[in-house]
């Protein structure tokens, strides 16, 4: 039983020491990113985080932002 405890503690410490997270990084607009800070859309597009999702969708800057969090579609320049 002590082996399981030691293994669990070792895994937790390894995770804490590497500083890996699944979320929590912020870009300059304060948008929480899922995995890394790369812009998720093609050049000329913008990233919309739908109100009912944690994943970004790409759309044209001229598209409606009514379903985007904060009513905003973030361009690559503002990412």
Curated annotation (Swiss-Prot):
Judging by the UniProt lineage, the source's domain of life is Eukaryota
Paired cysteines (S-S) = 41-58, 46-68, 48-73
Q: Which GO terms describe its molecular function?
A: toxin activity
Q: Where in the cell is it found?
A: Secreted
Which residues are the signal sequence here?
1-23
Q: What UniProt keywords are attached to this protein's entry? A: Disulfide bond, Neurotoxin, Secreted, Signal, Toxin
Summarize tissue expression: Expressed by the venom duct.
Residues that make up the propeptide are 24-37
- What broad class describes the main subcellular location of this protein? secreted
The entry's cellular-component GO terms read: extracellular region
The free-text domain note is: The cysteine framework is IX (C-C-C-C-C-C).
What is this protein identified as? Conotoxin Cl9.4
Q: Which organism is it from?
A: Californiconus californicus (California cone)
